[in-house]
């Protein structure tokens, strides 16, 4: 056993890993099997949660077959497509272990980059990662950069990649913050409220890979406008809460 592996085991006694999924029938088996390999090496108590957001393809059925083969895998189903934020909420709600990690079920991240983050949880409460050499089209890159800058400006945060789907949390955080967002703003709200509560956040870079199957969602104009509206609403809400706390 290597020194790093020993550190990783001491850093966590239990971890929940979940994957938000929408129409990922061609990716979810590979992503889950890779996670099982990585997590078994940690020799820790773990669970894997697949959150199927009302997929119109066979994602839900495939996820159930995976769970039937492995008792450490469970599936949460949305009857209809509720959106990314609601899918994250379902994952956090279903998680039962001391640490919670999530990454998307599209295979654009390598979950083997998660274990080196575990020793950081001795000093921090959240590890918020950022994409190295982001493998998306130019429009998504520009949208992501502008969104992150706007969020950081409004909430006074210094986060490099606010919506990077590779984050590790202490489970207790979700018992101590009230989340109002149900849409694309959930990542932002978690970090903003965690900072307000005094939780410690660190950041690390992770590699990002091209999508090899399925279709990206979430970048259409309707979703962007709705997220912008939610952002302003959340900013007003948290600013009002801060004024009450200071008075």
Residue ranges and their predicted role:
Residues 1-37, 44:
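N-proximal low-complexity "stem/linker" segments adjacent to membrane-targeting elements
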Residues 13-15, 36-50, 58, 71-74:
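Short loop->beta transition adjacent to catalytic acidic/histidine clusters or analogous donor-positioning motifs
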Residues 52-61, 107:
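A conserved acidic beta->alpha catalytic loop
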Residues 78-94, 99, 108-184, 210-227, ...:
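Acceptor/aglycone-binding surface of glycosyltransferases and processive sugar-polymer synthases
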Residues 46-49, 60-94:
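Conserved donor nucleotide-binding strand/loop of the catalytic core
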Residues 26-30, 57-66:
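Acidic helix N-cap motif at the loop->helix transition within catalytic regions
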Residues 1-15, 154-157, 179-247:
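Hydrophobic helical membrane-anchoring modules
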């Amino acid at each position: 056993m290597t020194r790093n592996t020993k550190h990783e085991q001491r850093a966590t006694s239990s971890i929940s890993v979940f994957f938000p999924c929408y129409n990922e029938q061609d990716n979810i088996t590979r992503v889950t099997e890779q996670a099982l390999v990585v997590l078994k090496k940690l020799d820790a108590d773990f669970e894997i949660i697949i959150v199927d957001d009302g997929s119109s393809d066979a994602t839900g059925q495939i996820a159930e077959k995976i769970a039937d083969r492995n008792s450490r895998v469970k599936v949460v189903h949305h009857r209809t497509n509720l959106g990314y934020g609601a899918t994250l909420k379902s994952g956090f709600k279903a998680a039962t272990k001391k640490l919670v990690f999530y990454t998307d079920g599209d295979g654009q991240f390598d979950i083997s980059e998660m274990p080196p983050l575990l020793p950081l949880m001795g000093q921090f409460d959240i590890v918020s990662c950022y994409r190295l050499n982001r493998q998306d089209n130019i429009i998504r890159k520009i949208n992501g950069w502008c969104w992150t800058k706007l969020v950081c400006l409004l909430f006074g945060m210094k986060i490099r990649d606010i919506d990077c789907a590779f984050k590790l949390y202490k489970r207790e955080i979700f018992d101590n913050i009230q989340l109002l967002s149900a849409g694309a703003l959930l990542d932002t709200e978690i970090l903003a409220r965690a900072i307000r509560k005094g939780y410690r956040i660190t950041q690390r870079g992770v590699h990002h890979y091209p999508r090899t199957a399925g279709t990206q969602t979430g970048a259409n104009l309707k979703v962007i406008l709705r997220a912008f509206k939610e952002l302003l609403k959340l900013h007003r809400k948290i600013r009002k809460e801060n004024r009450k706390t200071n008075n």
